[in-house]
From Swiss-Prot:
Keywords: ATP-binding, Cytoplasm, DNA damage, DNA repair, DNA replication, DNA-binding, Nucleotide-binding, SOS response. It is found in: Cytoplasm. This is DNA replication and repair protein RecF. The gene is recF. It comes from Mycolicibacterium gilvum (strain PYR-GCK) (Mycobacterium gilvum (strain PYR-GCK)). InterPro entries: DNA-binding_RecF, DNA-binding_RecF_CS, P-loop_NTPase, RecF/RecN/SMC_N, RecF_2.
Amino acid sequence: MYVRHLALTDFRSWSRVELELSPGRTVFVGPNGFGKTNLVEALWYSATLGSHRVASDAPLIRAGAERAVVSTIIVNEGRELAVDLDITSGRANKARLNRSPVRSAREILGVLRAVLFAPEDLALVRGDPGDRRRYLDELATTRRPRIAAVRADYDKVVRQRTALLKTASSARFRGDRGALETLDVWDGHLAAHGAQLIAARVDLVHELAPEVEKAYQLLAPASRPATVRYRSGVEVVEAEAAAGNSDPEVFEAALLDALSRRRDAELERGVCLVGPHRDDLELRLGDQPAKGFASHGESWSMALSLRLAAYELLRADGSDPVLLLDDVFAELDSARRQALAQVAASAEQVLVTAAVGEDIPVDWDARRIEIAMTDSDLGRVSVLSGVTQ
């Protein structure tokens, strides 16, 4: 799989750009703040419908513009697929597949399969559980696009149930049984959708575990062994996951029981205290959690291991995913740079950003695209300043 064409309109610092790409290695070179990362971000957005840098879409739209457009042409086993995404702040994205509109932008998920390495990856180790949940859900969705709908349905249930909890507390004191009966219904929805999401995550973690262990051993052979496991606030869910079981019916029953037991606490606080939106992917080095105990180098090795494991799972599913390397070589020591370069050597397409050419391995044969900034009627925008084959 590779990206043959990338076109952006009013995306970040780019007012308009069209790039013809090819298999092999391409390096986008330019000073920090000149827009090279925006190219990789656009491709990652096309693959996942999310940015690795911001949580909302508003910053993706160039200042002064009403919307941004990301267009790609993907080649997979000789077949071309064109994807167009219209990004409008505060509104649902619109998508086209081979120039035909699709009902939901989620329908384009899985067309571009990519793995991104970026400085933000340190948050997978040092950040909040939400960073690790997002990692799991993005990978699960890339491999099984239907999971995107499961996640969307679950998120909707959590929002609506949370709103109900905020009003049901006072209703209970008034003796209003209607609100509590409605809450029972939403408990069922949360348990059903939550169980499906947990099952997908648990299956994924079981496949990730040996790949993470292997990748970490490659990156840090003298360090402690790396392990991962799924953590849940529901004891039955965690025990079943640890035992290798991922039966949604078991998870659904466990969630319903936990919701019943935590009902009073939820009503008191007005938030959902049970469900996969509170779960975590635990990362351990030896007998210690990586978060809080891993050194800077160990944290980088663990973060890279998670991405390398994702790459190996996607490769095992079929065609090679596109590798996106955003300023990571400058962050790594020589051993980790070499390990990442070895993986990149076998990939069908690698797209890299670097502030200076010296950040790239010296033995790389790569096409080089220079990025610059210029002043225009639209303000300061990014432009292509040169291409070296």
